Amino acid sequence: MKPIIPPQNLSELLERANMMAGISLAQIAAHRGIAVPKDLKRDKGWVGQLIEMELGATAGSKPEQDFLHLGVELKTIPIDSKGKPLETTYVCVAPLTNIEGLTWQDSLVCHKLQRVLWVPVEGERHIPVGDRRVGTPILWEPDLQEQRLLQQDWEEIMELIALGKVEKLTARHGEVLQLRPKAANSKALTQSIAEDGSLKMTNPRGFYLKTAFTAMLLNKVFG
């Protein structure tokens, strides 16, 4: 199957996303000639990759927005029957070294969350993967209050990383943004700042949006 040409503009992207609303993942996968996994235990990113492919996203795993030419990040969000998010939303890998002078405005979190196309997808486990339907997409830009909350959490987390306290950061830190170990394999290691300012090895960390925050975003649109 030929890769889909990236959308030329925002209205084309939204048109593609709206055309998926109400369609099952099996229908999209069949159209792309892709097998549907029995479950997502070993294919956690499968839904997101399928939606990326269908919409013509270009970034892949690169540290930039999925539709860089449009300034849009794509996020699929698994929801329950009441439209509530079922899990936190991964944003990006957290930098653990060389962070002196890094500001919120220059951070990858800020860059990725400037404009997000949220694509809700049914995610309850009793629904077979292929039968799960895609919901109505939402194009979101953080308002001043949301920006403030995100920036505040990011700055507090980064300050603790700079002080060598990354191990003391738990998923409970942050009102809307949290830091968690990223690697599926707990043996994966990367460098981070130690409390004495030297470098030490630790598990890679990622930034995630808490479900209370994404639930608030969905609720603003769907009520």
Swiss-Prot record:
One of its GO terms (molecular function) is DNA binding. This is DNA mismatch repair protein MutH. Keywords: Cytoplasm, DNA damage, DNA repair, Endonuclease, Hydrolase, Nuclease. It comes from Shewanella sp. (strain ANA-3). Belongs to the MutH family. The keyword RNA-binding does not apply. It is found in: Cytoplasm. Sequence-specific endonuclease that cleaves unmethylated GATC sequences. It is involved in DNA mismatch repair. Coiled coil: none annotated. It comes from the Bacteria. GO terms for biological process: DNA modification; mismatch repair. GO terms for cellular component: cytoplasm.
